[in-house]
Amino acid sequence: MARVCQVTGKGPMTGNNVSHANNKTKRRFLPNLQSRRFWVESENRWVRLRVSAKAIRIIDKNGIDAVLADLRARGELA
């Protein structure tokens, strides 16, 4: 399973670990992904999504129905 948010599309970024001596080594910054179930009242069922913490805030603000409609319009959800 890819480390990508299904709502926002956020994925891993690359950067550097920087030591006190300013030595740099490559590293990955992973998104804060959570597997969450959301109750969809209009469909009377649970929907399981792998979402970032920001996506949970977006769902709280706009509602799960609006977010699912956007996902279906983009063709990312059946």
Curated annotation (Swiss-Prot):
<dbReference type="GO" id="GO:0022625">
    <property type="term" value="C:cytosolic large ribosomal subunit"/>
</dbReference>
<comment type="similarity">
    <text>Belongs to the bacterial ribosomal protein bL28 family.</text>
</comment>
<dbReference type="GO" id="GO:0006412">
    <property type="term" value="P:translation"/>
</dbReference>
<keyword id="KW-0687">Ribonucleoprotein</keyword>
<protein>
    <recommendedName>
        <fullName>Large ribosomal subunit protein bL28</fullName>
    </recommendedName>
</protein>
<keyword id="KW-0689">Ribosomal protein</keyword>
<dbReference type="InterPro" id="IPR034704">
    <property type="entry name" value="Ribosomal_bL28/bL31-like_sf"/>
</dbReference>
<dbReference type="Pfam" id="PF00830">
    <property type="entry name" value="Ribosomal_L28"/>
</dbReference>
<dbReference type="InterPro" id="IPR026569">
    <property type="entry name" value="Ribosomal_bL28"/>
</dbReference>
<feature type="region of interest" description="Disordered">
    <location>
        <begin position="1"/>
        <end position="21"/>
    </location>
</feature>
<dbReference type="InterPro" id="IPR037147">
    <property type="entry name" value="Ribosomal_bL28_sf"/>
</dbReference>
<dbReference type="GO" id="GO:0003735">
    <property type="term" value="F:structural constituent of ribosome"/>
</dbReference>
<dbReference type="InterPro" id="IPR001383">
    <property type="entry name" value="Ribosomal_bL28_bact-type"/>
</dbReference>
